[in-house]
Amino acid sequence: MSIVARKEKQKQEIRSLILEESMKLFVEEGFSKVSVRKIAERVQYSPTTLYLYFKDKNEILFYCCESGFEKMLEHNIALGLISDPIERLHQMGVNYLNFGLENPEYYDLMFIQEAPMAALIEMGAGWSSGDQALEALKMIVQDAMDKGLLVPAK
């Protein structure tokens, strides 16, 4: 392995460690009670080192949630193989519940705590994988409506 490749691998490992431990802290203590200094203590790096990887605590939160949505999307890859939109919708619900049970930290950060939305607004950003998850749901519902299996409320 070349020096450049080894350094890049080390950089990704540190970044992953920061995200993993930050997520645990956000869930344990709440986003507002966690500081970059506290995250740095947890990962045993200086706060300055964390700023080499992330702009601020909000950016750390953003990438924690983005990672969660990516994991959630992985649960839904096989949905396209189900032709019946009602069955697809049902399976998406099952996948959502299983995701929450298998990944309680991600679930709490993504859907329970208010901090992610505030961080998104402050950053002026959006979650591409979160948007994809919502779009998949909308497409299933629209397919069911197109086939007359779901009727809009009047």
Where are these regions (language model features)?
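N-terminal intrinsically disordered/low-complexity leader segments
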Residues: 1-13, 24
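Alpha-helical DNA-contacting segments of helix-turn-helix folds
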Residues: 60-68, 76, 110, 118
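Hydrophobic/aromatic residues within well-ordered alpha-helical segments
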Residues: 14, 57, 64, 68, ...
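Amphipathic alpha-helical packing segments from all-alpha helical-bundle domains
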Residues: 77, 121-147
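Amphipathic alpha-helical segments used for helix-helix packing
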Residues: 102-121
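Hydrophobic alpha-helical connector segments
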Residues: 63, 77-106
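Helix-turn-helix
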Residues: 17, 21, 25-59, 63
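Short coil/turn segments at alpha/beta junctions that flank glycine-rich nucleotide-binding fingerprints
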Residues: 28-32, 103, 147
